[in-house]
From Swiss-Prot:
Native source species: Pisum sativum (Garden pea)
Residue ranges, annotated region (Disordered): 23-57
Miscellaneous comment: The microsequencing technique did not distinguish Leu from Ile; however, residues at positions 6, 23, 44, 86, 87, 97, and 112 are most likely to be Leu as these are points of chymotryptic cleavage.
Classification lineage: Eukaryota, Viridiplantae, Streptophyta, Embryophyta, Tracheophyta
Residue intervals passing through the bilayer: none
CC terms in the record's Gene Ontology section: aleurone grain; vacuole
Listed name of the protein: Vicilin, 14 kDa component
């Protein structure tokens, strides 16, 4: 049954912090578009927030603004919310992978929200 095949394609898997650390030790960009690329951490909050109001601040770094993100074809967002504020999810339908880092009381957890096959959604 085709529906059964499709439902088995995008399985969410919980990954432990130790597994993430192990994977990130040797992580490199697979892109060959750029010969030189800065490496190392960057401070997302060193720029002005894209949006800011009484409820908090929304920071975004795009591939156009950061060479490392160009190599990975990646967008990075960060939100500082004040207590009692609410952020509704923003979903990019072209994203191949949506990964969320949830920080609660100083402890961070990665959550894989969705994954899409590159060919999914393309017209034949």
């Amino acid at each position: 049954d085709r529906r059964q095949e499709l439902s088995n394609e995008n399985v969410l898997v919980k990954v432990s912090r130790r597994q993430l650390e192990e994977l990130s030790k040797n992580a490199k960009s697979s892109s060959r578009r750029s010969v030189s690329s800065e490496s190392g951490p960057f401070n997302l909050r060193s720029e002005d927030p894209l949006y800011s109001n009484n409820s908090g601040k929304f920071f975004e770094l795009t591939p156009e603004k950061n060479q490392q993100l160009q190599d990975l074809d990646l967008f990075v967002n960060s939100v500082d919310l004040k207590e009692g504020s609410l952020l509704l999810p923003n979903y990019n339908s072209r994203a191949l992978l949506v990964l969320v880092l949830v920080v609660n009381e100083g402890k961070g957890d990665f959550e894989l929200v969705g994954q899409r096959n590159e060919n999914q959604g393309k017209e034949n």
